[in-house]
Amino acid sequence: MLFCDDSKKYLKEQNINLKNEFDKDDKRVEKFSLKHQNIYFDYSKNLINNYILKSLLESAEKSSLKDKIKQMFNGAKINSTEHRAVLHTALRDLSSTPLIVDGQDIRQEVTKEKQRVKELVEKVVSGRWRGFSGKKITDIVNIGIGGSDLGPKMVVRALQPYHCTDLKVHFVSNVDADSLLQALHVVDPETTLFIIASKSFSTEETLLNSISAREWLLDHYEDEKAVANHFVAISSKLDKVKEFGIDLEHCYKMWDWVGGRYSLWSSIGMSIAFAIGYDNFEKLLAGAYSVDKYFKETEFSKNIPVIMALLASYYSCTYNSQSQALLPYDERLCYFVDYLQQADMESNGKSVNIAGGTVNYQTGVVLWGGVGTNGQHAFHQLLHQGNIFIPVDFIAIATSHHNYDNHQQALLANCFAQSQALMFGQSYDMVYNELLKSGLNETQAKKLAAHKVIPGNRPSTTILLDELSPYSLGALIALYEHKIFVQGVLWDINSYDQWGVELGKKLGKNILKAMNDDSSDEYQNLDDSTRQLIAKVKNK
């Protein structure tokens, strides 16, 4: 693998000291920052210099990244294990140029489906869609899991100031009944519309929650016909949708060339449109499309997703980083980390290359984090004084939607202070002298100083948005989507399958059978540990 082999040979030997780099180059921020419209990307606090950046960019060229980008946007089946194109970008493409996949112009299909979703949203919002008893819909319950939940839920929360339809949107994902009950406790069966989001219409969690929601509805109405007024589906399995009782006119498409974790731009984003209105949903798509064009057309040295991917891959291959912290300093982005965990870790958590060979380098990392300033009082201690190498992405919003300017200034000051503290830290001498000034004697100061040293020289990137709007959020999400794609290219892995989740599903079905029948083959084939766990549950 060229990228990791090249980087490991010499880049760490540069021994970058961030304080020294800033001291000797007053143009460093200008050199190592980029802008796309209203998004400012400052990567000057990373362990790089001109030589390292040049080397990373050369590795990107060697990986045939330009060709891979063209292949993805043109509909080549880059998801090689499932023989599928990867075209979530087509869902937000505003051009009219035909895009042929398997003999069909998918642009026309996408346009038709968008219109269908728009009509449904407008029908429900206007009150023309009514519940079985004739009442107007007031609540939307989205039942889905993974990409059918994390993306829409994140966007609906992030864009709460743009909610404009008077519809309350709820999300149910976990097979734990508590997830469903939390929603059912606050909605009225006569004014609730359920969205079942499942391509196969057989995902265990989604199907079980949907069946229970259907039973809840029919307990109230006692009439099967009510289902058609209170359920719509997003699925490719029309027979199963019809059997459930949903009018096929209200079944919306999911295509094989859209992966679940990249599907919020599709009909899966219906719940978003119900919350913020279809016009704002289109602005979300437009923001992502602006990044798609920028990503395709911009040279690598000025291309934010490429630089993001190069930095992350550089730290993984050169510093053996196994973790990346994502710290959004905005409460509206409280679900952003959860969303990106799936997008990143399910995409790049692979240990074989595209040809099927075992890789001998590190690929995907653990992505984690949380909103500021909460994290400062929870896990930032590890970032500053722990002995684990953890690169950090800070996300900040320059202006807020509220009028509490003093809160916003404090929030931003804390964000910028954290990145500065990671970079500079505080030395033993600095701490020792401060302790003496505070009144401690020399013995006391020496004893305490070592505990207060913060090493610094820890890399971080700051992404600053002018505002958090549908357009800018769409752009931000797309930046990370393309970063994930570029990393997959650099590591020569398939970022668009997820075989690792299938075994657990299969075994889960077997264990469920075993729990209900200890004479079954499934039970007989269990290991002793699992049998004991089942026995403990049954004996309660």
Swiss-Prot record:
Keywords: Cytoplasm, Gluconeogenesis, Glycolysis, Isomerase. One of its GO terms (biological process) is gluconeogenesis. It is found in: Cytoplasm. GO terms for cellular component: cytosol. Pathway: Carbohydrate biosynthesis; gluconeogenesis; Carbohydrate degradation; glycolysis; D-glyceraldehyde 3-phosphate and glycerone phosphate from D-glucose: step 2/4. Catalyzes the reversible isomerization of glucose-6-phosphate to fructose-6-phosphate. This is Glucose-6-phosphate isomerase.
